[in-house]
Amino acid sequence: MPHTEEFDVIVIGAGHAGCEAALAAARLGCQTLLLTLNLDRIGWQPCNPAVGGPAKSQLAHEVDALGGEIGKMADRTYLQKRVLNASRGPAVWALRAQTDKREYAAVIKQVLEQQPNLRLREGMVTDLLIGPNDEVQGVTTYFGSSFRAKAVILTTGTFLGGCIWVGNKSMPAGRAGEFAAVGLTETLQRLGFETDRLKTGTPARVDKRSVDYSRLEPQPGDPEVRWFSFDPEAWVEREQLPCYLTRTTAETHKLIRDNLYLTPVYGGYIDAKGPRYCPSIEDKIVRFADKESHQIFIEPEGRDIPELYIQGFSTGLPEDLQLALLQTLPGLEDCVMLRPAYAVEYDYLPATQCLPTLMTRRVEGLFSAGQLNGTTGYEEAAAQGIVAGINAARFVQGQDAIVFPREGSYIGTLIDDLCTKDLREPYRVLTSRSEYRLLLRADNADQRMTPLGREIGLIDDRRWALFEQKQARIAAEQTRLTQQRVKEHDPVGQAIAQQTQAPIKGSATLADLLRRPNFHYIDLEAHGLGDPSLAIAEKEGAEIAIKYAGYLQRQQAQVDQVVRQSQRPLPVDLDYSAITSMRLEAREKLARFRPLTLGQASRIGGVNPADINALLIWLEVQERQRSQVETALVR
């Protein structure tokens, strides 16, 4: 009889979701197996080697604040860092790091290899072992090995039924040079899961030695480096490399328009939906036909490799046309192409088949995370991965699952959208997707998430002490700013009045001064009124709490009001077909998605406020009838 190894948790796939899931489960005490097609491609960045950007940076901060890795990896392997939207409000500040893709993969692999309770293994999972009560019991690989576990996490990325396209040529692959995973899609379909197809793409890579940099606009990193991780041990000061900017030309646009029919999408070879917010260059030319030019960013992929990533220039054109297309860009007239661009089509599981814990509704103990759930982006994958890892561990250990509410984090917003909206295109997190973005800032991710990470067991004593010390310093600085005053006739008071074009009447606290437009903590420091012992993040934390206090209080009041209503639980066996006062479409959608709370029900596409009102009335009538029956029985 073949030997079967036993684990608590098995993770299938070692991309950004799989790495976070495996680490979380192992750190919570579960014997964990991480299975991957290729041990040399763990934590790989197959598209843009970058972490962060609008809303994505908030996810990276939140994962770190919970005890995850993606932020630490970016801080240890960055080539360049910039804060985007720095001139706007703190709700949309976004840190972005260009990373060294090979170094990133090497460092995360080392972290995984050194993690207690975690074992890595190369293998292709083709089947799931299912028990008599529709519970997962383990997995089987292509070559016949079996591994048993009480929880299995699917983080297969673009590999399920993966097929890459260049022009009208295709081959089975999860990404260039790596074979696709076979069999698992059929297993999921046999178990009753719905699967569908999505597509994404990646641009060509060119040799940095063949580029004319005099024709490009340099994009340097910020002189003052910021960090994703709240743990100073992850911070590595290093020399930054520049990125560059060029633009498409009329020649670029003509070449694309003349050859659209040769691309897999416009040629009709594939019809899977691609990412709306990261379109191919041909999509841009078609959708924005009135634009004369589009920005193209030239970004390094590593310190010691010659490859440049051509951001914003993914294409499905045939390989023999791609070089001609690249050479229409200023600065790239003589460029050498090292890797062609390609599109990849793959199977995914619409995430409405998952609970907000990321356990599937159909099979107990089976979790799904990352690109398999229909998302796009390393940060979205990492966020789902840590949630799946936490909840898989808690499931195995008989503990209650953790649900992240959308009003508490971008992680919660992401998962709530996935589980309640019938999304049929790759999902990318955006600040506009959160109704509470002023509260869900990057700077306060540790305030929001680290206490939960501590409660779960992912934040150790050292990290917790750092957190408490930081919060104490911010609170003390807020107190000082509200108490220390500047007098009208003091030289510093006169200087500030002149700077802000507003007189100081009698005296003003430093907090009053911070509330003035275009006056910041850095200005207090310029007048000798700051605290030089504080870290930048602590100064910003104190300033934001004071400057935006009114807005923050109003939004928190809105959240509290929404939470009171939205957290009302709905019976899991509720017969929506019986609510005849509700529209048929709403009844069908609610019966299909089975929301757990009133808030989830209200966010399902096709369910409007009138439907929610009808549901509330029906629930109240049912409650009254139950009370009357219980009263009659007592009598």
Curated annotation (Swiss-Prot):
What GO molecular functions are on record for this protein? flavin adenine dinucleotide binding
Which GO cellular component terms are attached?
Answer: cytoplasm
**Where along the chain is FAD bound?**
13-18
Record-stated family? Belongs to the MnmG family.
Organism of derivation: Synechococcus sp. (strain ATCC 27144 / PCC 6301 / SAUG 1402/1)
User: Per UniProt, what is the name of the gene that codes for the protein in this document?
Assistant: mnmG
GO biological process annotations for this chain's record?
Answer: tRNA methylation; tRNA wobble uridine modification
Compartments where located: Cytoplasm
Ordered alphabetically, the record's keywords are: Cytoplasm, FAD, Flavoprotein, NAD, tRNA processing
- Name recorded for this polypeptide: tRNA uridine 5-carboxymethylaminomethyl modification enzyme MnmG
